[in-house]
UniProtKB/Swiss-Prot annotation:
Cited Gene3D superfamilies: P-loop containing nucleotide triphosphate hydrolases, Translation factors
This protein's encoding gene: tufA
Source domain of life: Eukaryota
Region (G4), start-end ranges: 136-139
Protein name (Swiss-Prot/TrEMBL): Elongation factor Tu, chloroplastic
Species the sequence originates in: Chara connivens
Annotated Mg(2+) binding sites: 26
Lineage of source species: Eukaryota, Viridiplantae, Streptophyta, Charophyceae, Charales
GO BP annotation list: mitochondrial translational elongation
Residue ranges of every copy of the tr-type G domain listed in the record: 10-214
Length: 408
């Protein structure tokens, strides 16, 4: 693991790029890191370094969510570059659930596309609180009126999904032109290039419009596991974003979910962006080195938690809203015995919906799109469940419902 110690001098904010495939999300991410590296210690990242997984590069499409870091004068950011390809919305659900705000990238040459709207809907569903818009590829648009039309169209799309579209900052520019300018002259300062200035303008909007979140550090520690890897000679590292609480070196923790057995272990190392930590706080993306745990013992979808604070369950009761067709949901009703996927934190588990009733206690045999119902769910394997926990229900590549657990 890393040797340099991470210094906390600025508020930490989790942000991400969302939007339609090929509208320039990864190019913009690279342009931001290169622009801000001029005035900070953060490492600039080239497009190829962000679009890193081999299967992504081959298709020119981002698959896994890629984490990079950068800082402005006011804040330290962890940035997740979200997939834009329809098959990989699953990753966006787990990636976007970690965002304190998002940059919606829309090509000024094309305007909003189906995935633009799907990503806005998903951002709403997983609780991304604020969105800032970057109209990319401005260099390809000669007519100012077209820019204004796209601006209007994007704002309308945001309003349709209950974001304050009339108040959302919209910055136009060209990530590619900024990237080219920075590649030719890496230390380009503000005021030297109009395209680089647009990136600064975008980050000013992000700094001022996306609020610094209040972190839940008083509650018992919990971190959903996103990824797991082995470090030779050191052990197994689990990565994820701390949902609540504080984790310190030497803490005893439990691994919970995906099987009945709860394992106990000790935290022997902590790091964030390859720098050592003494402790990790709610909201931070960290790597946790765990004593005596093999890679086969732990996987994405489990949680690491303070002992005795959360348990694995397969059966729970929840209050659920089933999306209407216009909201991207099902077109037809479903019945008891229906087996969709349940997305809970980073877990993705099939479950059987055993029974449902309306809020007033009336029983019903079928559930229609647009209904609010209470339902009993039986999962095929146990996951860490608690009251008031939110989840998404998905089927065939789309979200069909969202719910909150009230009993287990």
């Amino acid at each position: 693991m890393a040797q340099e110690v991470f210094q906390r001098t600025k508020p930490h904010v989790n942000i991400g790029t969302i939007g339609h495939v090929d509208h320039g999300k990864t190019t913009l991410t690279a342009a931001i890191t290169m622009t801000l590296a001029v005035n900070s210690t953060c490492t600039p990242k080239k497009y190829d370094e962000i679009d890193a997984a081999p299967e992504e590069r081959a298709r020119g499409i981002t698959i896994n969510t890629a984490h990079v870091e950068y800082e402005t004068a006011l804040r330290h950011y962890a940035h997740v570059d979200c997939p834009g390809h329809a098959d990989y919305i699953k990753n966006m659900i787990t990636g976007a659930a970690q965002m304190d705000g998002a940059i919606l990238v829309v090509s000024a040459a094309d305007g909003p596309m189906p995935q633009t709207k799907e990503h806005i809907l998903l951002a709403k569903q997983v609780g991304v609180p604020s969105i800032v818009v970057f109209l990319n590829k401005e260099d390809q648009v000669d007519d100012e009126e077209i820019l204004q039309l796209v601006d209007l169209e994007v704002r309308e799309s945001l309003i349709n999904y209950e974001f304050p579209g009339d108040k959302v900052p919209v910055v136009s520019g060209s990530a590619l032109m900024a990237l080219q300018a920075l590649t030719e002259k890496p230390n380009t300062s503000r005021g030297e290039n109009k395209w680089v200035d647009k990136i600064y303008e975008l980050m000013d909007a992000v700094d001022s419009y996306i609020p610094t979140p209040k972190r839940d550090i008083e509650k018992p520690f919990l971190m959903p596991i996103e990824d797991v890897f082995s470090i030779q000679g050191r052990g197994t590292v689990a990565t994820g974003r701390i949902e609540r609480g504080i984790l310190k070196l030497g803490d005893i923790v439990e691994l919970i979910g995906l099987n009945e057995k709860i394992r106990s272990t000790v935290v022997t190392g902590l790091e964030m962006f390859r720098r050592l930590l003494e402790q990790g706080f709610a909201g931070e993306n960290i790597g946790v080195l765990l004593r005596g745990i093999e890679k086969k013992d732990i996987e994405r979808g489990m949680v690491i938690a303070q002992p005795g604070t959360i348990e694995p369950h397969t059966r729970f009761e929840a209050q659920v809203y089933i999306l209407r067709k216009e909201e991207g949901g099902r077109h037809s009703p479903f019945f008891a015995g229906y087996r969709p996927q349940f997305f809970v934190r980073t877990a993705d588990v099939t479950g059987v919906i055993e029974a449902f009733e309306y809020d007033n206690g009336d029983k019903t045999r079928m559930v229609m799109p647009g209904d609010r119902v209470k339902m009993i769910v039986n999962l095929i394997c146990p996951i860490a469940i608690e009251k008031k926990m939110r989840f998404a229900i998905r089927e065939g590549g789309r979200t069909i419902g969202a719910g909150v657990v009230y009993k287990y």
